């Protein structure tokens, strides 16, 4: 597995302790929000510093953000592909889901409204994860 240090340097950024700490956290725990990252990281990194690091990593293409409906931005290191997300309505767990194999139908809108070079679609499926489903069965 590629390390945070390698990813940062490969993107042409200077490898700093805050960048490595944030990226290490996202490599092991994807889909975190900035407040979740802030509470998990050393207190030496200010909130503004955290947002600066996230913005640097996002602009360098190492991290991407997405916002499920009703949620603040979440960050992940899975970039460069067109994947989507399953979100549990009960516990909030988020799981990556690959787009269709071959030519993704989700990249072919019925009406492109004059847009060109359409290269990404965001799809979020909502449901109940297996853990919550099993828990609900046990409560019946």
Q: Model segments located where?
A:
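Short alpha-helical segments that sit at the start of domains
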Residues: 1-23
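Short acidic, hydrophobic short linear motifs in intrinsically disordered regions
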Residues: 32-41
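Short capping segments at the starts of secondary-structure elements
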Residues: 17, 29-33
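Basic amphipathic alpha-helical segments that dock to polyanions
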Residues: 50-62
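Short, locally clustered residues in the helix-turn-helix/winged-helix DNA-binding domain
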Residues: 24-28
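Non-DNA-binding regulatory cores of transcription-related proteins
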Residues: 62-140
């Amino acid at each position: 597995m590629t390390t945070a240090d390698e990813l940062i340097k490969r993107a042409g950024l200077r490898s700093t302790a805050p960048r490595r700490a944030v990226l290490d956290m996202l490599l092991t725990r994807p889909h975190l929000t900035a407040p979740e990252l802030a509470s998990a990281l050393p207190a030496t990194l200010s909130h503004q510093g955290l947002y600066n690091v996230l913005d640097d990593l996002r602009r360098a293409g190492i991290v991407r953000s997405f916002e499920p409906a009703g949620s603040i931005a979440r960050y992940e290191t899975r970039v460069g592909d067109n994947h989507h997300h399953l979100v549990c309505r009960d516990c909030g767990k988020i799981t990556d889901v690959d787009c269709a194999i071959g030519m993704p139908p989700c990249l072919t809108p019925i009406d492109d409204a004059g847009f060109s070079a359409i290269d990404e679609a965001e799809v979020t499926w909502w449901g109940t994860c297996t853990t919550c489903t099993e828990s609900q069965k046990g409560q019946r």
